[in-house]
Amino acid sequence: MKLVIVSGRSGSGKSVALRVLEDLGYYCVDNLPLPLIGSLLEQLKGSNDLVAISVDVRNMPEQDKVLVQQLSNLPAGTEITSFFLNSSDKVLLKRYSETRRLHPLSKSRVSLQEAIKLEGKLLEPMSKLVDHYIDTSNLNIYDLSDQVRQILLGSVDKELVIYFESFGFKNGMPTEADFMFDVRFLPNPHWELALRPLTGLDEPVAEFLNRQPLVNKFIWQIENLLETWLPHLERNNRSYLTIAIGCTGGQHRSVYVAEQLAKRFSNGKHKVNVRHRELDNAKA
């Protein structure tokens, strides 16, 4: 079992790091007291091999030797990777002033500046024990995400899951779509009596549409558009992308186009899924 522990000063980006870990398939728990880590790992044994927790100053032991002892009591075979995120007092003060969030150590008689300094002092033992120390003072959330992925995977690349979904406009547009393409202007197999009862998954319909230059040109243009912008979407920390293709009934043209696009992007670079809303609903 792999365990990633994310600690650091409040406002330095722990929640960002935890979201990256969640995208990588880790079971994530925020602000878990260290004495409970062993119980958590026992509960998840056999169901989750990747676990990540974040701890803040309120859950940290005062003595570093207590911390070492707590970690040594974890189940045998636990592979631990630890991060400590930090930023300068000036940057943390600016971030808290902008978000107006309450600092974990803020009290009625303690100013924000004093709370930030106190937290840094309390977390100093932990900062000396971790595997990876990251100063986020000059990092944005994308830079930090890339660093965490680089450390864990050896690469900043993340797997973007692409969903191609066909649908019929007569039944409403899918609300989850990031891109939507209307193919109702393409030649319609519905008007071919022999093809009317079939779907875009059937070979006769596929052959009919493949013979249409307009269909092939439109598919090529969508492919080119997506190929151009996918790298930028990936760098923007997108985990998935839904591309909806709509025709009148969601039976012929949209199904065929969605299938063709899914095949073209199933090249190993991305995880691709295709679903046909109207066909699936008809089976239900």
From Swiss-Prot:
GO terms for molecular function: ATP binding; GTP binding. Displays ATPase and GTPase activities. Belongs to the RapZ-like family. This is Nucleotide-binding protein Sputcn32_0712. ATP binds at G8, R9, S10, G11, S12, G13, K14, S15. GTP binds at D56, V57, R58, N59. Disulfide bonds: none annotated. The keyword Nucleotide-binding applies. It holds the Pfam family PapZ_C. The keyword ATP-binding applies. Keywords: ATP-binding, GTP-binding, Nucleotide-binding. HAMAP family: RapZ_like. It comes from the Bacteria.
